């Protein structure tokens, strides 16, 4: 049994398989998940698990080079934006419109669905390298 890091076997497998620039998405419970993209559904009820809890665990176990957010988060969920920036201080941040964000999710290796129910609580994490 693992002692630390991501314990969810599906998430751990996806993280282990990522190459440089591959992407994964951590999403609120409302983001549409495109056909053909691996869905890892953690949502058990509204708010559980939270977006920020899942982001923290994944970020602790992943080399992240870049972060993509919907620009709408700036005016519609400033608290989540602030918390993301506090948790992810090293990567480059990119902002795109929500429709473009949803297009980008089609290329993700996986989308991790949380129970989060606040607007635009979604992030695309671009894998970096550990060397």
From Swiss-Prot:
Q: Which SUPFAM superfamilies match?
A: RbsD-like
Q: Which UniProt keywords apply?
A: Carbohydrate metabolism, Cytoplasm, Isomerase
Q: Name one GO cellular component term.
A: cytosol
Biological processes per GO annotation: D-ribose catabolic process
One Pfam family linked to the record: RbsD_FucU
Q: Provide the reaction this enzyme catalyses.
A: beta-D-ribopyranose = beta-D-ribofuranose
Does the entry feature the keyword Isomerase, yes or no?
yes
**InterPro entries for this protein:** D-ribose_pyranase, RbsD-like_sf, RbsD_FucU
Q: Enumerate the subcellular locations listed in this protein's record, separating them with semicolons.
A: Cytoplasm
The text of the family note is:
Belongs to the RbsD / FucU family. RbsD subfamily.
- Could you describe the subunit structure of this protein? Homodecamer.
Function description = Catalyzes the interconversion of beta-pyran and beta-furan forms of D-ribose.
Full protein name? D-ribose pyranase
């Amino acid at each position: 049994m693992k002692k630390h890091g991501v314990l969810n076997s599906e998430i751990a497998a996806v993280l282990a398989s990522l190459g440089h620039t591959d992407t994964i998405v951590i999403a609120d419970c409302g983001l549409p998940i495109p056909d053909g993209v691996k869905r890892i559904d953690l949502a058990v009820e509204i708010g559980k698990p939270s977006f920020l809890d899942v982001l923290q665990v994944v970020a602790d176990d992943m080399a992240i080079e870049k972060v993509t957010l919907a620009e709408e988060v700036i005016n519609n969920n400033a608290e989540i934006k602030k918390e993301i920036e506090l948790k992810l201080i090293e990567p480059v941040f990119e902002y795109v419109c929500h429709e473009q964000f949803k297009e980008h999710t089609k290329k993700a290796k996986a989308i991790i669905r949380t129970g989060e129910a606040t607007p635009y609580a979604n992030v695309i994490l671009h894998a970096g390298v550990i060397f």
